[in-house]
């Protein structure tokens, strides 16, 4: 849609906001957040920073922000990085700059890319349930820096051999997924098998990134560079 194409446009400032307390609750934050979002969107310093999320006097990059509490007004946080800036009484303060972004001209995205989260005692049962003929890609939410049980790692080989891209993120709230351990199922072995290690994103956003890449026609080394960049 034209709306989705506009998000993140270098010439437009896109700011998302909302409320954690409805208008009939004491201390409703909706109107204040709306005003803050307008201030951010109208500030020249907000140009070319991608899609922003403004809540509770903080400015976050939509790429990294996540909800951390069910009801708290300060629920939206950016793990590891922190916010890009703050809403002050008289001005908008940015103390970080957004990194350059790759943009694709896509009308829509489609494809089957499920998310599987690792757990103690996991074997190959979940991957066995997948229809490999319909599968476009897979996101693995791994332990720690990027490790999964041995049996699961062995089963991933069948996907990789069929050319199905597998991307890995950490289950941890903070930190970066990276290959550290060399045992069967460890990150080093997974990377050698062809698993992509996605930095800084959670599983849901890694899924969207992989879908965007596949719909943009990225394959092989170009796909790896984009997913791990």
Regions found by a protein language model. Name each.
Residues 16-88:
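Internal gly/pro-rich beta-alpha loop/helix module
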Residues 150-229:
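ATP/nucleoside-binding phosphotransfer catalytic cores, i.e., glycine-rich phosphate-binding loops
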Residues 5, 129, 151-155:
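A short acidic, amphipathic alpha-helical/loop segment
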Residues 19-22, 143-145, 172-175:
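Short, ordered loop/turn segments at secondary-structure junctions
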Residues 12-15, 165:
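Proline-centered loop/turn at the N-terminus of a beta-strand
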Residues 15-18, 52-56, 117, 141, ...:
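Short beta-strand segments
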